[in-house]
Amino acid sequence: MNNKKVAIITGSGRGIGAATAKLFATNGYAVCVNYKLNASAANAVAEEIKASGGTCIAVQADVSQEDDVTRLFDTVDHQLGVVSVLVNNAGILRQQMRLEDMSADRINAILMNNVTGYFLCCREAVKRMSTCHGGVGGVIVNVSSGAARTGSPNEYIDYAASKGAIDTLTKGLSVEVAAENIRVNC
């Protein structure tokens, strides 16, 4: 373990998440690269960070699954230290289609990954960051989308609705934990 600040970036094996993980590492954070399926991509990001002198681990966890989220945070606690920053970035998007063509399985998968996953990760971060639980505070960033405001008709309103829920989660949680030295933003 080290004395660096610790950042967990969910869904950071590629794209925005990978770039965010590298940015935090460049700024001196010990980083957890979280991934669901693509171990080789996540490990490549982690190795790049380590090759640049950073501290990084890659941890597989499906953020829509409560046990996986608990294991993710416990692993970070033991290998890097207590989380200082959580970036909720993991999310899924499916083929564009109209609502009448969407199955309940599709809608539930989007909501489990994009909403429940953020709730679970926020919960575990707050347990560790909150001054009410002996923490020193921290930062939670929930990655949202402009689709939350446009609704994305004829494309993916299920995804848009999930991001609207994230905006509401962020607003409510930011007020709930502000006095505990935790900042929450989109």
Regions found by a protein language model. Give the residues of each.
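Active-site loop of short-chain dehydrogenase/reductase
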Residues: 4-5, 54-55, 82-83, 129-144, ...
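Catalytic Tyr-X3-Lys loop
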Residues: 84, 100-119, 141, 159, ...
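Catalytic loop of short-chain dehydrogenase/reductase
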Residues: 93, 135, 141-165, 170-179
